[in-house]
Amino acid sequence: MKKIRKGQYGYRDANKKKRITYVALFAVTIAIVLVSRFFVPMEDIKNLMMITAILLVLPAANLASPLLVAWKYKTTPKEFYDAVKPYEDKFTVFYDLIITNTDLIMPVDSAVIHPTGIYLFCPNKSVDVKKAEKFINEILVGWKLDGNAKIMVEKKNYLNRLASLRDLTEEDDDGSVEYITKVILGLSM
């Protein structure tokens, strides 16, 4: 089975399944350690087993917290993926991202990186678009890149914008696309 990486179609669901598996394994391990305490006669070892169980909770919680944040976001609908897929040959395209900061949880079904800007489609109409654009642009400027991210919440507008983008030429490539790629994937969980 091929591993689905961050930014590839199907990442949200694959990542969710992987995290559920890890959290379940931790929960079973913690339960085994706690139950086995009752079969050990020495008090010192019982205490060590209790400490072990408590310490196992920390990585389990570390895996569970992003899972809880991303729980309600499913993989991008196949129809939308099929509509954006033709642009993969022309531009750098990412799917199934969830961009977060302390004030923002924004699902991004598709992100296209182009020298004229970063174009993101967010299906959640309740996201404060101006605030989200400001956050992403500040991060880009902090990395000495052009802060020109555009977030669209209307599917039709997003697809029209992609259709209007001109093809990349060698003169357009200033090398910033790979840096922007790292930044956008770094912002996503």
State what each model feature region is.
Residues 90-158:
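Membrane-proximal soluble helical/coiled-coil segments
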